[in-house]
């Protein structure tokens, strides 16, 4: 940027159409967050009515993660072929319909299936909204675009907590899910009133349709095998999270089978850049493993271990959700200032100072607990607002929505595993200790994976001929692409 451009406030670099695009996507993400966290708020009520064990109840949270990988792939491919806008609208309709079905669910299996539908819609909303906004904003503001957008999910969680405190004590838990149908009205408005993303229009204007991940996997020469593997993965995930398997060895084998299938899909769809894709899935997996035990089981911890009433639970969750929302915005500024990866690492390191105190002080002082949660979530969860920007930078425009959607949502299976891990550990320890120990230890893994830029590093080790040296979204260099003692111009720079 020129000196004159740098002196202009960042928000003046955006025109009205870009702000409208952001506002529409942000509201969609808010509604996504609202619908998704409802189950966590009423988990104890659902558990009591359906007579579920703690692990079974936690699996209702996990169900939405089980289907996310397929939703991210299919709806992401829709976004790559037909535009980000259509994928956004379809995603909102899916997660709204699933939420309504939860309100009518007569038992565990029906609600589990409804949660699968929510997961597919949520995955599509994540990939399509993130790529839509990032590709609509100027390159030097795309960390802000990512962070500001993802804050909508946390705001949706805050709104859901407040609605929970007003609705559930009077009308019961089912009424909360009936409210979740409202986003469909918003989806119809979106279809008519928002423009298409600029990057997508430039890439596809007047050109033949691109070959998407769905084309590669389900219309290519290996389509029969891939369909069989898709069904196998779905079945394995079902048994892992809803089949009530008691044998840990069987669960481990099924988990390894799913991992092999997802890696196969990544290798087929990304070619020589498969090491980058696989490592991105690992990064996201651990990002969910460190953050989602708290996200999913914090309401249960507040109601059971601390014996808070619904009103107090809602107030504490307000601090938590608002902290995450503020953190997403702060992360956007940090990412544009320090760089995406450096901002991520610094924020996570700071969050580690707070995670133990959050669960050590007990529930005697609600305000102190709320403030600690605010800052811990601001630093630890909020920085995930720039994760779409981080992932999207490794993919070209014509495969970004599906690449981001599939990679992120396969890794998001960590979010399916996280609450069950927390519940299992809580059978031997108290729930607060289980949540703190999981989050504290796994955060360090994410710090190493992102700080060392392991996607680029592993790509350089295994398939250096396909190494990308610069971020495809903002053009900044990847630190892991540069070997120690070598000049950057000795590396192969792939076409962005």
From Swiss-Prot:
Predominant localisation class: membrane
Q: Which GO terms describe its cellular component?
A: plasma membrane
- What are the protein's UniProt keywords? Cell inner membrane, Cell membrane, Membrane, Sugar transport, Transmembrane, Transmembrane helix, Transport
A UniProt-annotated Pfam family: MFS_1
Keyword check for Transmembrane helix: yes
* Residues spanning the membrane: 22-42, 58-78, 92-112, 116-136, 148-168, 170-190, 224-244, 247-267, 278-298, 313-333, 353-375, 406-426, 431-451
Q: Which InterPro entries match?
A: MFS, MFS_dom, MFS_trans_sf, SA_transporter
From the UniProt record, list the reaction(s) this protein catalyses. N-acetylneuraminate(in) + H(+)(in) = N-acetylneuraminate(out) + H(+)(out)
Q: Does the keyword Mitochondrion apply?
A: no
Membrane topology of this protein: Multi-pass membrane protein
Task: Identify a single GO molecular function assigned to this protein.
Answer: carboxylic acid transmembrane transporter activity
* Subcellular location, record wording: Cell inner membrane
List the PANTHER family: CARBOXYLIC ACID TRANSPORTER PROTEIN HOMOLOG, SIALIC ACID TRANSPORTER NANT
Q: Which family does it belong to?
A: Belongs to the major facilitator superfamily. Sialate:H(+) symporter (SHS) (TC 2.A.1.12) family.
| Function field | Catalyzes the proton-dependent transport of sialic acid.
What NCBIfam families does UniProt report for this protein, alphabetically? Answer: 2A0112, PRK03893.1
- What this protein is called in its record is Sialic acid transporter NanT
């Amino acid at each position: 940027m020129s000196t004159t451009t740098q002196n202009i406030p960042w928000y003046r670099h955006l025109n009205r159409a870009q702000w409208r695009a952001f506002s529409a996507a942000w509201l969609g993400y808010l509604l996504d967050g609202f619908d998704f966290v409802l189950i966590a708020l009423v988990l104890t009520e659902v558990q009591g009515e359906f007579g579920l064990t703690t692990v079974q109840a936690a699996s209702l949270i996990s169900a939405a993660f089980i289907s996310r990988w397929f939703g991210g792939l299919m709806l992401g491919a829709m976004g790559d072929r037909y535009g980000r806008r259509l994928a956004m609208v379809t995603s909102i309709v899916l997660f709204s319909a699933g939420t309504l079905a939860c309100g009518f669910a007569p038992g565990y299996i029906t609600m589990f299936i409804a949660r699968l539908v929510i997961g597919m819609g949520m995955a599509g909303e994540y990939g399509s909204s993130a790529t839509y906004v990032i590709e609509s904003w100027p390159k030097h503001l795309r960390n802000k675009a990512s962070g500001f957008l993802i804050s909508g999910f946390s705001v949706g969680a805050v709104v859901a907590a407040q609605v929970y405190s007003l609705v559930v004590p009077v009308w019961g838990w089912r009424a909360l899910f009936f409210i979740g149908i409202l986003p469909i009205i918003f989806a119809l408005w979106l279809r008519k009133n928002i423009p298409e993303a600029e990057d997508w229009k430039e890439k596809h204007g007047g050109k033949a349709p691109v070959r998407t991940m769905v084309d590669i996997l389900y219309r290519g020469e290996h389509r029969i095998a891939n369909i069989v593997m898709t069904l196998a993965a779905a079945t394995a995930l079902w048994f892992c999270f809803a089949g009530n398997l008691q044998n840990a060895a069987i669960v481990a084998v099924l988990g390894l089978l799913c991992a092999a299938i997802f890696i196969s899909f990544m290798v087929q769809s990304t070619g020589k850049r498969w090491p980058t894709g696989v490592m991105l899935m690992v990064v996201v997996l651990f990002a969910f493993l460190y953050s989602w035990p708290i996200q999913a089981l914090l309401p249960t911890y507040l109601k059971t271990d601390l014996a808070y009433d619904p009103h107090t639970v809602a107030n504490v969750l307000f601090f938590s959700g608002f902290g995450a929302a503020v953190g997403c915005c702060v992360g956007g500024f940090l990412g544009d200032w320090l760089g995406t990866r450096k901002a991520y690492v610094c924020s996570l390191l700071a969050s580690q100072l707070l995670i133990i105190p959050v669960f050590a002080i007990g529930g005697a002082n609600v305000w102190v607990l709320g403030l600690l949660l605010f800052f811990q979530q601001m630093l630890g969860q909020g920085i995930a607002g720039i994760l779409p920007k981080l992932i999207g930078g490794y993919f070209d425009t014509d495969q970004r929505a599906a690449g981001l959607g599939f990679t992120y949502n396969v890794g998001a299976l960590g979010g399916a595993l996280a609450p069950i891990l927390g519940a299992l550990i809580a059978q031997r320890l108290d729930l607060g200790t289980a949540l703190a120990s999981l989050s504290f230890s796994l955060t360090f893994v994410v710090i190493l994976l992102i700080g060392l830029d392991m996607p680029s590093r592993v790509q350089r080790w295994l398939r250096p001929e396909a190494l990308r040296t610069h971020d495809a979204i903002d053009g900044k260099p990847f630190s892991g692409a540069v070997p120690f003692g070598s000049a950057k111009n000795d590396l192969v720079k792939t076409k962005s």
